[in-house]
Amino acid sequence: MLAFFLPVFLLSLMIGLPVFFGLLAAPGILLWLNEQPRDLALLYRNVYNGMDSFPLMAIPFFMLAGVLMNRGGITTRLVEFSQAIMGHFRGGLAHVNILSSMLFAGLSGSAVADTSAIGSMLIPAMVKNGYTRKFSAAITAASSVIGPIIPPSGIMIIYSYVMGESVAALFLAGIIPGVLVGLGLMLMTWVMAQRYDFPVATKRSTWSERGNASMKAFFPLMTPVIILGGILGGVFTPTEASAVAVAYSLVISLFVLKSMVIRDLPKVLTEAAMTSSVVLLLVGAAMAFKTVVSLSHTPEILAEWILTLSENPLILLFLINLLLFLVGMFLDAGPAIIILAPILGPIFINLGVHPVHFAIIMSVNLTVGLATPPMGLVLFVASSVSGERIESISKAILPFLAIEVVVIFMITYIPAVSLAIPRYFGFIIGG
């Protein structure tokens, strides 16, 4: 069965079918060939059932909050804050780009939204200040992968939905890995800045200027604090937190900062609806794909095959990192998690890997795949925003991908990187 599903799915992608149809093509064709029209109808019913979930409501709400923040000029305030903190370093705008992505991650949780919002502001500014266009696009794409790692994160919500893990535990587990990716990118930027004599963006800001920038960014920076604080304090669930984030974003954009007016709302709602509908359709299709694959006993066959490769968990973790990294190049993280997590998760949990630890290994690998040549999605977004050819961006991003791979191995072989914070807050007991 696996020999049928995989080639049909890959062929559908190669001929240009959207991923949604590709995920339905293989099981649909199989059921049609077997003359099982009732099961074929059940397949498409599973698409609806896959989206009909209360926890998944958090995804469109968080996306709407991110769009509200972006349309409300919040991105500009975050960039100004980052520039006041780091603009005076050599290679300052590259550092500003990375720090802005880390801050924006707490608002949107999306790599594509990060690339579009931060890139449209900083890539032209970086080019104007003497950076090459390909480098500017590459650092934007590389830093955008922080978005789905630092909470709130759409892919963590999907993982929780599929595997039954605590969303709060997954959110907390992503904090240190996300910060490590950001610090690693800053280190590589510093090395390159010394070698290639990158320009300094601004003179050192005074404490007064930093204070002013901090005040302007105060309300946006409070968004992740409110979300995580409310969840950890038991005030609301992660799904309710997403609705609170929308209400908070709406109030500060319309009434506090007054950076939006009521007539902007239809455009904001339309943009958020279109973005979230794409994600939810992929989730529904992936759930239908997973259902048919499970009926064919493919997961059990694949699990047995993986265990024949080695009995050493460290070697298996290395191999699974490689697999997930490759999958992330071609398939969006959400559908990949829905399809692969139920197959791979139990294998490694039985080998002694903590469920939350494996969730972060999987999520970070698939997220970094978004920025990996030749098919990484954010490379196409960065190319569109910057006007630079994908081939040039792909070459320029390689040093940053090397850093992100190092962080992946740190996460994999040092469990405390992902487990320390959720254990501290009591979401993980023992193990």
Predicted regions and their residues:
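Alpha-helical transmembrane segments of multi-pass membrane transport proteins
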Residues: 1-431
